[in-house]
Amino acid sequence: MKRRKLSARRRVRTGSALFLCVCALAGAALWRMLAARVTMPPEMGALLCFGLPAMIGLFFIDGIQLRLVPSRALSPAQTLWLALTGVLAVCPMTLLADVLGALAGRFTLPLAAATAGAVPTAVLKLLVNDALFVPLFEEGFFRGYVQGALACYGEKRVAAFVALAFALAHGLSMNLPGLFLMGLLLCALALRTGSLLSSLLVHGLYNATLVLLSCSGLGALFDGLTPLSCLLRLLGCGAFAYAMRRAFAAKGALPSQESGLHLEHRDMLWLGAALMSVVLALLLSRLMEVLL
């Protein structure tokens, strides 16, 4: 009887995860359509499409499920090699996108054209959004909730599914294969280290590197298939492979007595109130911009 109840609960959690995943992907697609017509705070999209579903899945829809979140501490060696992996991931990702773009007869939008010459305040805003908010909400949803909720289907299958959902959440483009591979890497890191911090660190530093390259004007060195660009990125690919190998091989910190995060109901309410406060603040700021 007990085994049957556990099985039933697992099916409910799996269905909930799939439902929230569909909602997140649909919300991301709708947000891209709205953002193309109406100026909206970029961090609000990540919050509503991924942060809110993660919170619903971890706290409400099936009760408190924080034990799904991999929360083992990282060792200094892991942190170092993971940080280098995130920074150097720009090389294989941009090279793959350019090769696929060339095969398709066109190139992707150059990094240098996106935000080159941006003022420092704009750079800081981009860094806060792309290197903090977006990785936090996306990793919390995909690697923190969905990957744990679907673990009963096997690590490899779930990693492939989560990576595909992660790639589709960014839209259909020449970057889709690269985003899928990045999703696989982030899933593998979370599984190997037993810590969501690993995928969060790599994701955040990868995004931060893209922003800094774009704003500094150095993004031109990572675009196109010129000899210099290809040579530079091929060397970077070698360094990326080495850093990734060391990150997987590095020994983790000693695990704590309890695996998973544990919050009291009062802490959960405070967290929910904080999240809702952020949502209201973003909505009010947008409303004030429209009115004034």
Task: Give the predicted meaning of each segment.
Residues K2-K5, T39-V87, C91, D98-L109, ...:
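Membrane-helix interface linkers and caps
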Residues K5-E43, L132-F133, F141, L205, ...:
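Transmembrane alpha-helical insertion/packing segments
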Residues R13-A29, W81-C91, W270-L280:
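Alpha-helical transmembrane segments
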Residues L18-D62, W81, P227-L235:
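Alpha-helical transmembrane segments in multi-pass membrane proteins
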Residues L25-A36, R67-T79, G101-L109, L172-L185, ...:
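Hydrophobic alpha-helical transmembrane segments
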Residues A26-A35, I56-I61, P92-A104, A169, ...:
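Alpha-helical membrane-inserting segments
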Residues M40, L66-G140, Q147-C152, L283-L292:
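Juxtamembrane helix-loop-helix connectors linking adjacent transmembrane helices
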Residues K125-L291:
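Transmembrane helix-loop-helix hairpins at the membrane interface
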